[in-house]
């Protein structure tokens, strides 16, 4: 646990919690770490979980795969981020799956153990609950943003909506996106070939430049 202590302190879930309170809080959360290989399923869709996942290293994709194998990428979680918190809190079956995008280390935390009242009324407990609510709110905003992109009528409009949002997020017109081509197509729920054709059309129309996952938006 000691080698991960700095990563835990830096995670948004534990922001503002006194370092002296962390060991006891982690014990209450029954914190357990495990490493996963690229492509390995961390939490399968359709099962229940009483634990959220905290990404200690690497990255995780939150995905939905339908009966025919079509994939919808819901989110990409990197170091310090959490996933499955809604399902851990409610006890509902997972409607998405969590898959290791790269080799990663995941710490499972039984967050339900601290959702009730704390007998010691400790500040760390209250802060953790507040941080969890903030993370849930942030995830909701990100999901609404994804719905906004997907709600556009054409592949071209979906691309422009997503890239515009990324430019606004970075604060400049030149930026990197976190997805490769297939992942971006899965995130926007479009055909990869059609999306690639539209990217080339946008480039030819003088709207943007790109190389791999690096983009420059033009006026």
Segment roles from a protein language model:
Residues 155-158, 162-219:
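Phosphate-/nucleic-acid-contacting segments
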Residues 129, 133-136, 140-143:
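Long, hydrophobic or amphipathic alpha-helical segments
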Residues 1-38, 87-89:
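Cyclic nucleotide-binding regulatory module and flanking cytosolic helices
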Residues 28-29, 47-49:
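Short, small/polar residue-rich loop motifs at catalytic or cofactor-binding pockets
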Residues 41-47:
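Short phosphate-coordinating micro-motif centered on Lys-Gly-acidic
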Residues 29, 73-133:
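Cyclic-nucleotide recognition modules
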Residues 39, 50-63, 68, 79-80:
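Glycine- and acidic-residue-biased ligand/ion/polar-headgroup-sensing regions
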Residues 123, 143-155, 169-175:
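Short, Lys/Arg-enriched, Trp-marked, Pro/Gly-tolerant hinge/linker segments that flank
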